[in-house]
Amino acid sequence: MKHLLKLLNPSLLLPIVSLLLVSASCKKDDPTPPTPHNDEEVITTFQFKITDSASNATTTYFFKDPDGDGGQSPFYGPTASTQSDSVLQLQNNRTYFVQVILMDETKSPATITSDEVNAEGQDHMLFYNNGSTTIISASNPYTVKLNGSDMVIKYTDLDSGSPQRGIGLTTRWRTYTTGKYPLNITLRHQPGVKDGTYAPGDSDISVNFKYQIN
């Protein structure tokens, strides 16, 4: 490099040095590509924990699709891994505290996906429906009535949005009419469009149970 600099006209060195400095500056200032963020929740297990407010007894029911999009067949519980459906057993004129736990069991240890849903509650909402559902209150606490059984479901959690809205991971159920009824629970992913209604966004998971009020 010393010999090269001697041969060059000094008047030519300044543009060359400037070019080298600009090139180095551009390399230094080149932004690092951002790491892609995966917003899709992986859910292989939907679990209900139902606590009778009178007896304080808790019963767990679940739906599992062990390998997600793989070839294993999904199943219900709690009694056996071969159940084709699950019936939630409830007593009439009772109040129940209900918690939904969502998991990704393709990982070891399993990931509690409902923790992520709760943390991003302003983008998520669980909807409970039996084919004919009436919204009793769209404000807090968000409350619906499942027509036919007249069971009332009141949301007991709130997101961090403004205004705050229910998420549906924890709810309080009140039973009124005996019989056996269908129940669909759908988790809607509604980033930036959550308004307390089902329509906006996409479904992360939708599971069908039945409930028996005795």
Predicted regions, residues:
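A composition-driven surface/loop motif
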Residues: 41-59, 177-183, 187-191
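N-terminal edge beta-strand
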Residues: 63-90
